Curated annotation (Swiss-Prot):
HAMAP family: GrpE. Belongs to the GrpE family. It holds the Pfam family GrpE. GO terms for molecular function: adenyl-nucleotide exchange factor activity; protein homodimerization activity; protein-folding chaperone binding; unfolded protein binding. Gene3D superfamilies: 3.90.20.20, Head domain of nucleotide exchange factor GrpE (2.30.22.10). Participates actively in the response to hyperosmotic and heat shock by preventing the aggregation of stress-denatured proteins, in association with DnaK and GrpE. It is the nucleotide exchange factor for DnaK and may function as a thermosensor. Unfolded proteins bind initially to DnaJ; upon interaction with the DnaJ-bound protein, DnaK hydrolyzes its bound ATP, resulting in the formation of a stable complex. GrpE releases ADP from DnaK; ATP binding to DnaK triggers the release of the substrate protein, thus completing the reaction cycle. This is Protein GrpE. The keyword DNA-binding does not apply. Homodimer.
Length: 201
């Protein structure tokens, strides 16, 4: 009987343990499935975070590049503004220079009565031109040079045996540049070249 009672108690122990094992396996499978879902969720969140981080880095790099471009443009604009700040002032000085040139042209340097005036105007004009050159204003006097539409304004064309075609034969009014930028074009008469053209038969 003791053997039977041992068998009975062993059967009872096995019956009691077996449901626990089955319950444990089911709960483990359940936990494993939940863990797998959680891993997938975390991997998806990680991928989204990495994508967002890459996008933010890209936006940050673009913003830094744009900031650098703005700084470069601003520095260039400041340099241009400083370089050409005198443009209006220089334009106002050009008629004064023109008037001094006309005074020189209208005065005879050989005549004793006007010689002193001529020399005074000439010295004043040289000093004036030297002063404006220090600020980047230079004369455009294209006498005898090829016609350049960027710096010259043609008033007309005339035939000339002395000057080849498209050459400035007369400067009516000198032009001026401010730091290599045109302030006023030179008013010029352009040569058409010789009056006759040889034609071969």
């Amino acid at each position: 009987m003791s053997n039977e009672s041992n068998n009975t108690s062993q059967d009872q122990v096995e019956e009691a343990v077996t449901p626990e094992i089955v319950v444990d396996e089911a709960s483990l499978m359940d936990e494993l499935t939940q863990a797998n879902f959680r891993i997938e969720e975390l991997e998806q969140l990680l991928a989204e975070s990495e994508t967002a981080l890459a996008e933010r880095k890209d936006v940050e790099m673009r913003a830094a590049a744009e900031t650098q471009n703005i700084r470069t443009r601003a520095a260039k604009d400041v340099e241009q503004a400083r370089k050409f700040a005198l443009e209006k002032f220089a334009n106002e000085l050009l008629p004064v220079i023109d008037n001094m040139e006309r005074a020189l042209q209208g005065t005879n340097p050989e005549d004793e009565a006007t010689k002193a005036i001529y020399e005074g105007v000439e010295l004043t004009m040289k000093g004036f031109l030297t002063s404006v050159e220090k600020f980047g204003v230079t004369q455009v006097n294209p006498q005898g040079q090829a016609f350049n539409p960027e710096h010259h304004q043609a008033i007309g064309m005339q035939p000339s045996a002395e000057y080849p075609a498209n050459t400035v034969m007369m400067v009516m009014q000198k032009g001026y540049l401010l730091n290599d930028r045109l302030l006023r074009p030179a008013m010029v008469m352009v040569s058409q070249g010789g009056g006759s053209v040889d034609v071969e038969a």
